[in-house]
């Protein structure tokens, strides 16, 4: 890295990925500044740590910087980017800064269309239990860290790798995890063959002494593995996996219990406090990584048992009068199905979903998959599509999506208030209310808790 006297400036510092890198760079002893369009709880935390924050983008913000880091949402016409270019200040992507941090460490990178954040966090928890004290950069706030980043004192770095813009190809990890392949980020990739080629390049980037860990239960990923030139260790429920997941009856107060069978031994049992087979598979990836690092079995057991989840991943927001309110980030059909299956396995009497589709393009491209995503929901209130800076597309609306789904109990809500009122009117003790989506739907979870509390007798 360059001299610590120079300042690192982040444009779009309030993003979950950018903020984590900024915190690591700050903790390494560099002066850090950043700009974003508005202040948030994320930027407030960074300011409290010592980051100089600018609200809004202006050319003057980059003066005195030694390097400028940009998120994928920042284009070349941004005034800070233009000023940095004019002053010959290096402008790099977030992934390039992460790659520079990883270059100095034993890098473990987690990629895949779904489950990256949770899997990265589980690996970090297991390594911490094994006293490896890793540096961690993840795309969500981890309960145990109180943040989405942590600077460790060892040479291990565990990071979530972002495939959405191909920037994960800038990383050079020693170990990788690939959780799955799916039709996602099709604004960046031409087709599934293009997705497969990118992941193939990612997995072949590990050195000859490194390895890849991949989920064989995902058909698209399993089909790709014969083309990988570097070592691959597979995990999954399939008997052909190197690390075979075998489910066990859960103990009281535990969501899932499983063991891992390999050619050498049977490991476990392992207990998880987060529900769903998708989380068991995420944990299996953490076990496989731990085995590559020769961690003791007890450390793996403790690391997984102590894992309490990640912000917005099946996150409990409250229980009022027997009604449970949970918030989840799921917005892709695969994620929706996994989340609803996990909720159904938890034994709730009814599952009432408040869903906000994310992006017009995703709704259009995955329409056929959305149609079958809500089978495990009792009722669904469908909010308007969260644009995420996209322009509307003709015929792509939440009302049209509801019509395509054609499932009893799935209805379009013309307003947030209509959705909240409808879902509260039908919720009863023993039921679950689930706010679901990647937009601002999470803001409704506290409101639902508040409304339920207001109905309680004085």
Curated annotation (Swiss-Prot):
One of its GO terms (biological process) is peptidoglycan biosynthetic process. GO terms for cellular component: cytoplasm. GO terms for molecular function: ATP binding; UDP-N-acetylmuramate-L-alanine ligase activity. It is an enzyme of class 6 (ligase). Keywords: ATP-binding, Cell cycle, Cell division, Cell shape, Cell wall biogenesis/degradation, Cytoplasm, Ligase, Nucleotide-binding, Peptidoglycan synthesis. Signal peptide: none annotated. SUPFAM superfamilies: MurCD N-terminal domain, MurD-like peptide ligases, catalytic domain, MurD-like peptide ligases, peptide-binding domain. HAMAP family: MurC. Cell wall formation. Belongs to the MurCDEF family. This is UDP-N-acetylmuramate--L-alanine ligase. The lineage of its organism: Bacteria, Pseudomonadati, Acidobacteriota, Terriglobia, Terriglobales.
């Amino acid at each position: 890295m360059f001299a610590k006297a120079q300042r690192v400036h982040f444009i779009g510092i309030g993003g979950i990925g950018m903020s984590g890198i900024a915190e690591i760079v700050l903790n390494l002893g560099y002066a850090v500044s950043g700009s974003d369009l508005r202040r948030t709880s994320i930027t407030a935390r960074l300011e409290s740590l010592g980051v100089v924050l600018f609200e809004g983008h202006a050319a003057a913000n980059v003066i005195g910087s030694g390097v400028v880091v940009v998120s994928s949402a920042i284009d070349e016409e941004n005034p800070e980017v233009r000023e940095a270019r004019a002053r010959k200040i290096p402008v790099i992507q977030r992934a390039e800064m992460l790659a520079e941090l990883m270059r100095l460490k034993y890098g473990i990178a987690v990629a895949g269309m779904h489950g990256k954040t949770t899997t990265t966090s589980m690996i970090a928890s297991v390594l911490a239990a094994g006293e490896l004290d890793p540096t961690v950069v993840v795309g969500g706030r981890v309960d145990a860290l109180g943040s989405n980043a942590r600077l460790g004192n060892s040479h291990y770095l565990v990071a979530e790798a972002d495939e959405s813009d191909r920037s994960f190809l800038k990383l050079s990890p020693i170990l990788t995890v690939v959780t799955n392949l799916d039709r996602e980020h099709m604004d960046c990739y031409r087709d599934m063959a293009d997705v497969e080629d990118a992941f193939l390049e990612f997995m072949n980037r590990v050195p000859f002494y490194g390895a890849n860990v991949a989920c064989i239960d995902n058909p698209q990923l399993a089909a790709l593995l014969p083309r990988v030139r570097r070592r691959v260790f597979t995990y999954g429920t399939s008997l052909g996996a190197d690390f075979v997941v075998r489910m066990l009856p859960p103990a009281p107060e535990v969501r899932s219990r499983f063991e891992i069978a390999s050619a050498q031994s049977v490991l476990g049992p392992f207990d998880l406090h987060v529900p769903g087979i998708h989380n068991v598979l995420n944990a299996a990836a953490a076990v496989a990584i731990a085995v590559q690092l020769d961690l003791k079995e007890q450390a793996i057991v403790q690391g997984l048992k102590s894992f309490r989840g990640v912000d917005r991943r099946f996150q409990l927001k409250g229980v009022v009068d027997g009604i449970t309110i949970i918030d989840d980030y799921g917005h892709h059909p695969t994620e929706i199905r996994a989340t609803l299956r996990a909720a159904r396995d938890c034994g709730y009497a009814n599952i009432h979903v408040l869903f906000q589709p994310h992006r017009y393009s995703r709704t259009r491209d995955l329409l056929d998959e959305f149609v079958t995503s809500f089978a495990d929901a009792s009722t669904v209130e469908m909010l308007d599509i969260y644009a995420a800076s996209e322009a509307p597309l003709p015929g792509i609306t939440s009302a049209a999506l509801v019509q395509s789904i054609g499932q009893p109990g799935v209805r379009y809500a013309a307003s947030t208030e209509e959705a909240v009122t409808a879902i509260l009117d039908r919720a009863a003790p023993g039921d679950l209310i689930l706010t679901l989506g990647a937009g601002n739907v999470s803001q409704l979870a506290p409101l639902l808790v508040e409304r339920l509390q207001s109905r309680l007798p004085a």
